């Protein structure tokens, strides 16, 4: 038997098993920024008393002559 044949008869060696690369630790989940506090609703305006469209009519003052009557 030649040297070559002997080598061929050797059982094939399985390829060396590569050690599985260690997975890098998974990143910790990103920290969620704290949720914004709910926006503070501006306080509702106090209910407005019904405003009359027109200001109340003030009684017109009695007519006054522009000029006082000339005393004779």
Swiss-Prot record:
Repeat: is it a keyword of this entry? yes
- Indicate where this protein is primarily found: cytoplasm
List UniProt keywords, sorted A-Z: Cytoplasm, Keratinization, Repeat
Q: Which InterPro entries match?
A: SPRR2
Q: Which residues form a coiled coil?
A: none
Gene Ontology CC, one term = cornified envelope
Region (3 X 9 AA tandem repeats of P-K-C-P-[EQ]-P-C-P-P) residue ranges read 21-47
Q: Where is the composition biased (Pro residues)?
A: 56-72
Question: Where, subcellularly, is it found?
Answer: Cytoplasm
**Signal sequence interval, chain numbering:** none
Instruction: State what induces this protein.
Output: By UV irradiation and carcinogenic agents. During squamous differentiation of epidermal keratinocytes.
Instruction: Give me the disulphide-bonded residues.
Output: none
Expression (tissue specificity): Suprabasal layers of squamous-differentiated tissues such as epidermis, esophagus, tongue and trachea.
* Ranges occupied by sequence repeats: 21-29, 30-38, 39-47
- What is this protein's function? Cross-linked envelope protein of keratinocytes. It is a keratinocyte protein that first appears in the cell cytosol, but ultimately becomes cross-linked to membrane proteins by transglutaminase. All that results in the formation of an insoluble envelope beneath the plasma membrane.
- Family per similarity comment: Belongs to the cornifin (SPRR) family.
Q: What is this protein called?
A: Small proline-rich protein 2B
Q: Which organism is it from?
A: Homo sapiens (Human)
Give the gene that encodes this protein. Answer: SPRR2B
């Amino acid at each position: 038997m030649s040297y070559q044949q002997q080598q061929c008869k050797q059982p094939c060696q399985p390829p060396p098993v590569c050690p599985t690369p260690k997975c890098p630790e998974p990143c910790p989940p990103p920290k969620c920024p704290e949720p914004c506090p709910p926006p503070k609703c501006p306080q509702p305006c106090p209910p407005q008393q019904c405003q009359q469209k027109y200001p109340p009519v003030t009684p017109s003052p009695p007519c006054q002559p522009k000029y006082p009557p000339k005393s004779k």
